[in-house]
UniProtKB/Swiss-Prot annotation:
Catalyzes the formation of 4-diphosphocytidyl-2-C-methyl-D-erythritol from CTP and 2-C-methyl-D-erythritol 4-phosphate (MEP). It comes from the Bacteria. The lineage of its organism: Bacteria, Bacillati, Cyanobacteriota, Cyanophyceae, Synechococcales. Gene3D superfamilies: Spore Coat Polysaccharide Biosynthesis Protein SpsA, Chain A (3.90.550.10). Its EC number is 2.7.7.60. InterPro entries: IspD, IspD/TarI, IspD/TarI_cytidylyltransf_bact, ISPD_synthase_CS, Nucleotide-diphossugar_trans. It is an enzyme of class 2 (transferase). It holds the Pfam family IspD. The record marks R150, K206 as: Positions MEP for the nucleophilic attack. This is 2-C-methyl-D-erythritol 4-phosphate cytidylyltransferase. GO terms for molecular function: 2-C-methyl-D-erythritol 4-phosphate cytidylyltransferase activity. Transmembrane segments: none annotated.
Length: 223
């Protein structure tokens, strides 16, 4: 299985003043823990880190223990463009790919393998967790318009897995139609292509704030 890891987090909400994936968690960078988790999955054979050229030296230094197992890919000015660059940098033999957020350093190898195996029967899969809070849809003035049934609501995570040809086609159509999305599964939705949900777990958080970092430290003790 081939894995692409977008790693261009600005760190603005972390108030880090640099790429948030370079922030330390228990003595190692966030990207270190992410790469370690991904490479622990038995079905993973190739990993590409997609980042900005100005971060390349520091990011690669922080994962030097895995330098012979990863490939660097220059990213674009958005996540969407970066993933497209990643797709175009995959080996020609790659048929399936997992896209995983660099800031989700607590994903377990079992979940990565599960996503990979589900791609045997599906063109697209994503990890997600059931929403437990009541969600409100509001208008632009802040007034509630609707309360959707939470039984049908899932919070998307990564990895998100795809057949390479299908995902590349989706990105090409997005460029043609000037679509902008926040995750790759959304492109499939816009094209009315099916995406299968795989239930994830609550520890697979995306670290975007100082509070997330504190929570991650607690999870890491049992990781």
């Amino acid at each position: 299985m081939h894995v692409l890891i977008p790693a261009a987090g600005s760190g603005s909400r972390m108030k880090a003043g640099r790429n948030k994936l370079l922030i330390e968690l228990e003595g190692e960078s966030l990207i270190f823990w992410t790469i370690k988790s991904v490479l622990s999955a038995s079905l993973v054979s190739w990993v590409g880190i997609i980042g900005q050229p100005y971060d390349k030296q520091e990011l690669l230094k922080s994962v030097k223990n895995f330098s012979n197992k990863i490939k660097w890919i220059n990213g674009g000015d958005t996540r969407q463009k970066s993933v497209f660059n990643g797709l175009n940098s995959l080996p020609s033999t790659a048929e399936k790919v997992l896209i995983h957020d660099g800031a989700r350093c607590l994903v377990g190898p079992d979940l990565i393998n599960k996503c990979a195996m589900e791609l045997e029967q599906n063109d697209a899969v994503i990890l997600a967790t059931k929403v437990t809070d009541t969600i409100k849809i509001v208008d632009n003035r802040g007034y509630i318009k609707e309360t959707p049934n939470r039984q049908n609501l899932w919070a998307a995570q990564t990895p998100q897995g795809f057949l390479v040809k299908r995902l590349r086609k989706a990105h090409e159509m997005a460029i043609e139609k000037n679509w902008t999305v926040t995750d790759d599964a959304s492109l499939f939705e816009m094209l009315n292509w099916q995406v299968k949900i795989i239930e994830g777990n609550s520890s697979n958080i995306k670290i975007t704030s100082p509070l997330d970092l504190k929570i991650a430290k607690l999870f890491l003790k049992d990781f």
